[in-house]
Amino acid sequence: MGNSNELICIGLEGTAEKTGVGVITSNGEVLFNKTVIYTPKIQGIHPREAADHHAETFIKLLNEVSGVIPLDKIDLVSFSQGPGLGPSLRVTATTGRALALSLKKPIIGVNHCVSHVEIGKLKTDALDPLTLYVSGGNTQVLAYTGKKYRVIGETLDIAIGNCLDQFARYCNLSHPGGVFVEQYAKEGKKFLKLPYTVKGMDISFSGLLTASMKKYDSNEKIEDVCYSLQETAFSMLTEITERALSHTNKPEIMLVGGVAANDRLKEMLEIMCNEQNVDFYVPEKQFCGDNGAMIAWLGILQYINGKRMDILDTKTIPHFRTDMVDVNWVVKSTENELDILNKKRQIPRHLIGKGAEADILKGRYLEWESITKERIKKGYRTAELDEMIRTRRTVKEARFLSIIKDFSVNSPHIFDIDIENKKITMEYIHGKLLKDLIEEGNLEFCKSIGELIGKMHEGKIIHNDLTTSNFIVNTDAYMIDFGLGKYSDLIEDKAIDLIVLKKSIMSIHYDKFGEIWDKIIEGYSKYGHSELVLQYIKEVEKRGRYL
């Protein structure tokens, strides 16, 4: 190692079209950080051309580094091992190996996604954030729990950056397209109705992209299409982040990734955080997009916490998921850090609950105990979109809470519906949330939960927001919160329903996940369609970006 107490690491980033080199110390001081983007002459990234760009650019950037700090002062070499494009990753890994061997220094391959989270924490005051990671290749909602960054929500098809870039290419805009979409969106005035697809804490952009292209083809102004595309997509992202916040009760939210540079997305998330009374963080622009400093910083964190890697272990991992990384550096047993990790989002005292969509107030309806669920206005959404969503979901919830009883699924009785004010007054169920029972170690009702879901699916009803927060248990189990519900007998929709539940369990009940999931599936398997649905879960999960 070097002569001082500081460890100096050089990081090489090259997962797609951006080539980055960064140098950082173990005290978090960035000595060098530069990224050069490959801009294709013809729209779209060609993997081989991107790899050639890396090969040329790494040499230039390393020469620049040597003018700032002698390379023999480097103590550690870190490189992005994945996820990413195969050709790009191979060039990056080869450069890292050659550099480590020539300098006779240790080498560590790191996860690109986790690097974004850790550089964000370094460059902000965030300590235990719920993280929205948005880029050209990734869209994930992440939370640290059980020594991993768990993927609580993610895209079911394409990433948000990819969506924006594809639309820009369709409109003959230059790469990277998201920048031009943002510029045009600022001039848009007319909001165009587009598909809004949220499934629990997961999200889908493919339908939105196709519809936006059709709007462009129908001679709508490009400014209005970009405005509507951006407002719809970013509202969806903000909503799934808020849903994850409601489920995990994290005290802070952080935005990272290349799309984090978008001012409108930052504005939306900040508004939501103010409404939920949690802190919001986003690193400065140079640390939002892909960069070498983030790779170097994660290399340091892993190295000083015991990670070692032989040169033979540096094979690239194109499908390197965030939740594959063992995270042993977050808590180091100081009382202050433990207090931070135990800190939770606070719910206003006059409410008995505050979800992602609604405030829950306890009261009385005639002689019965009741709760009133009010879908409150969301300041981050345009007025037209907000009114449409709140009205539609209030109607849906009232309808499905009533219909679900026809299939022997318990749900609260509805006393009153106020569509104008987006309120539903319903029976107060004495009991505990399934989430709280599991935290107490009581898994007795998990099999019954599986049976309820099976009955619901036999009735061709999809909940679309199955989490352990949406079941109440006393002597029986009750299902609640049908605002995203729909009719469908598609095997895929039933599989996605269960996947949403699976992720919610893993996000906060990771230590009991196997036992909980086995019991739920045991109950669900009583129903005739179950075998096909359970098989299809594996097919849907394979679509996950970098699974």
UniProtKB/Swiss-Prot annotation:
Name of the protein this chain belongs to: Probable bifunctional tRNA threonylcarbamoyladenosine biosynthesis protein
Binding site for Fe cation: 112, 116, 133, 290
Residues engaged in binding L-threonylcarbamoyladenylate: 133-137, 165, 178, 182, 262
Keywords assigned: Acyltransferase, ATP-binding, Cytoplasm, Iron, Kinase, Metal-binding, Multifunctional enzyme, Nucleotide-binding, Serine/threonine-protein kinase, Transferase, tRNA processing
Cofactor binding, note field: Binds 1 Fe(2+) ion per subunit.
InterPro entries listed in its UniProt record: ATPase_NBD, Bud32, Gcp-like_dom, KAE1/TsaD, Kae1_archaea_euk, Kinase-like_dom_sf, Peptidase_M22_CS, Prot_kinase_dom
Top EC category: transferase
UniProt KW Iron keyword: yes
Reactions the enzyme catalyzes: L-seryl-[protein] + ATP = O-phospho-L-seryl-[protein] + ADP + H(+); L-threonyl-[protein] + ATP = O-phospho-L-threonyl-[protein] + ADP + H(+); L-threonylcarbamoyladenylate + adenosine(37) in tRNA = N(6)-L-threonylcarbamoyladenosine(37) in tRNA + AMP + H(+)
Signal peptide: none
Every Protein kinase domain range: 346-547
Intracellular or extracellular location(s): Cytoplasm
Listed EC numbers: 2.3.1.234, 2.7.11.1
